[in-house]
Amino acid sequence: MNLKKKNNDIVLEEVWCENGAGSTLPLLKYPLLEQTGIVEHCFTTRIGGVSKGIYESLNLSFTRGDEDAAVRENFRRLAGAMETDVSKFVFTDQTHTTNVRRVTAEDAGKGIVKERDYTDIDGLITNEPGLVLSTFYADCVPLYFVDPVHRAIGMSLSLIHIS
């Protein structure tokens, strides 16, 4: 699946990536963000994971009742597809605030391989290469920020709900 503009430029691209578990999973990417040379990014779908039942397949939430082991394996597969490690992920603690946290290498792994020492964070920013900023969306609009001057990136959710 690729979404295109009138002039046939690809706006959103589906890329199938090896996940390190012997299979593939689809990642959705914005070519314009990739072209900055500053950020590698993706959106996930529900395809390519191990969760069962109502959480089938690539559930990435530890807070919805899925088994932690399944969610961890799903993140391991996502990290494999992104050619990184889960210890590089940094998670928000989304509660619909306007709080944004600047994250550093000290924050790597918080929310997945070690405890978060912060709460009520709906946005993340960094200028440190190698960190994976992780935010979660259901009916909010995801926001990506790229600052080419300071070589910084950010992610947040909008406080405007789609539904």
Question: What annotation goes with each model-predicted range?
Answer:
Residues 1-163:
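Active-site microenvironment for binding and transforming phosphate-containing groups
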